[in-house]
Swiss-Prot record:
GO terms for cellular component: cytoplasm. Its EC number is 1.13.11.-. GO terms for biological process: catabolic process; response to toxic substance. This is Putative ring-cleaving dioxygenase MhqO. PROSITE patterns: VOC (PS51819).
């Protein structure tokens, strides 16, 4: 039986200094830092999670900040553009806000929608689009109030070394619906109302190189542990090499690299980011995986200090 994902769970990228990263995603874009922890495989590196007030799936962008990291190259085998969705009528606010913080942007139209495209301080390609769908983000930070706040992901643009094979995966395995073709892009839509629109570029542009300003992986939603195990079996049955389940504290994760060389993850919606903090205090303290807690002092000494601060 075919399966269907509700859409994007989170997107994880590599960036530079954590203060620059936090100033942009919290200070400029108004997202909430819902979790500060460390990389499970490299406890000397932060893992920072930004999203809506509740840190819900479909709103979470996560970062490995490496100060002084080599600049990456955006290209095939990666998410090329991360799309954010805002309420109808909010675009004028965002254009003024980007201007206020001297962030250059361009306006484009794709599939009948108006987008504002810009880069973060470390070179990640971002865009904003207005849509009715998706619940409002009730978080207020600085001048970013719920009537204009980013709701979460509008979706993403995928760059593939083998677009035909990636297209087959999206439609026939991940369960997305093909809803249109325009120029060099095919559009897919998932069943969810956030993180639900995927544009696939049909022409390869050259292999990307991992580094600052590039996306490391895109994660798709599984309802729960049982659903994730179904996904694991289902994907493996189609010839993909899938990892064992990995406990990431706030979700369980499995990974596989699709034929276009993009690293895919399937992550469970539960338990979520209030798993080890209260909803009210999420993101305020460094939370460590249990195996690293005995080494907290040493780990904290090796991490660059940063703070969430209003820039308005």
């Amino acid at each position: 039986m075919a399966k269907k994902t509700m859409g994007i769970h989170h997107i994880t990228a590599i960036v530079g200094h954590p203060q620059e990263n936090t100033d942009f995603y919290a200070g400029v874009l108004g997202l909430r830092l819902v979790k500060q922890t460390v990389n499970f495989d490299d406890p000397g590196t932060y893992h920072l999670y930004f999203g809506n007030e509740g840190g819900k799936p479909g709103t979470i962008i996560t970062f490995f900040p490496w100060a002084g990291a080599r600049q990456g190259v955006i290209g095939d085998g990666q998410v090329g553009v991360t799309s954010y969705v805002v309420p109808k009528g909010a675009m004028a606010f965002w254009e003024k806000r980007l201007e206020k913080f001297n962030v250059p942007y361009t306006k484009i139209e794709r599939f009948g929608e108006q987008y504002v495209e810009f880069d973060d301080p470390h070179g990640l390609h971002l865009e904003i689009v207005e849509r009715e769908e998706g619940e409002a983000n009730t978080w207020t930070f600085g001048e970013v109030t719920p009537d204009v706040a980013i709701k979460g992901f509008g979706g993403a643009t995928l760059l593939s070394e083998q677009p035909d094979k990636t297209a087959d995966l999206l439609e026939n395995i991940m369960g997305l619906e093909r809803v249109g073709k325009e120029g060099d892009f095919v559009r897919y839509r998932s069943a969810g109302d956030i993180g639900n629109v995927i544009d696939l570029k049909l022409t390869p542009i050259g292999r990307g190189q991992m580094g600052a300003g590039t996306v490391h992986h895109i994660a798709w939603r599984a309802n729960d542990d049982e659903d994730q195990l179904d996904w694991q079996r289902y994907i493996a049955s189609h010839g993909y090499g899938v990892t064992p389940v990995r406990d990431r504290n706030y979700f369980n994760a499995i990974y596989f690299r699709e034929h276009g060389e993009i690293l895919f993850e399937i992550a469970t919606d539960p338990p979520g980011f209030a798993h080890d903090e209260t909803q009210e205090t999420m993101g305020e303290k460094l939370m460590l995986p249990v195996q690293y807690e005995p080494h907290r002092t040493q780990i904290e000494q090796g991490l660059l200090p940063f703070e969430v601060r209003e820039l308005d």
